């Protein structure tokens, strides 16, 4: 599971529509795009699906081409090998001038499994001890499983049994995004790490392994 609390600014690409939830409550839904430039100079235009309180009347305000800022809970998952970002907000969405910069910033809550490569300890250029590792979250798509990878950097190294290859962890930290060869890369600057105690459903999902 990858859940983030974020604020994002971008341009609406598909005008808002009124929809109805399973509970019979009305809400509006639209998509927006936020471009990211990677360290390698490549660019990724990332689309974000946004859902917010509203109805057909308020949906008319959110037309394609308008620049907006929205804050809420962002869910990240894979489907058919593509990364999807879905934002749910309960707060007012701001309309912005064209000069307002694109952005997507916030915090990440991650639950998943550390890769078989385990933990890498190293020193920064200034000689400060650090750690890096990769971990994945799995989502079931029909009969198949999809895996979303996150790269973590830990500035306060931990040497515990639960922080090792193939261990399940819950990580909280700052969401960081990069682009490599035109593909979005998920990164996180760690604030806290703890062992993840799986329930039966989560365990069934987590036991699946990426090829």
Segments (PLM) and residue ranges:
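Short, structured interface segments
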Residues: 74-100
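Short nucleic-acid-contacting surface segments enriched for D/E, G, S/T with interspersed K/R
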Residues: 55-70, 155-170
């Amino acid at each position: 599971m990858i859940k983030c609390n974020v604020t994002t600014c971008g341009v609406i690409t598909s005008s808002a529509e009124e929809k109805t939830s399973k509970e019979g409550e009305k809400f509006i839904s639209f998509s927006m795009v936020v471009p990211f430039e990677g360290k390698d100079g490549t660019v990724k235009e990332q689309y974000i699906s946004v859902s917010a309180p509203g109805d057909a009347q308020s949906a008319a305000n959110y037309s394609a081409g308008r620049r907006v800022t929205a804050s809420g809970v962002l869910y990240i998952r894979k489907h058919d090998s593509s990364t999807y970002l879905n934002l749910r907000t309960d707060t007012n969405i701001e309309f912005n001038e064209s000069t307002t910069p694109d952005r997507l910033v916030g915090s990440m809550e991650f639950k998943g499994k550390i890769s078989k490569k385990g933990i890498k300890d190293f020193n920064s250029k200034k000689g400060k001890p650090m750690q890096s590792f990769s971990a994945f979250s799995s989502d079931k798509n029909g009969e198949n499983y999809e895996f979303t990878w996150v790269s973590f950097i830990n500035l306060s190294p931990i040497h515990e049994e639960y922080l090792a290859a193939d261990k399940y962890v819950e990580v909280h930290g700052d969401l960081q995004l990069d682009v490599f060869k035109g593909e979005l890369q998920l990164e996180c600057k760690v604030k806290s790490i703890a062992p993840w105690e799986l329930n039966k459903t989560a365990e069934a999902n987590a036991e699946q392994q990426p090829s």
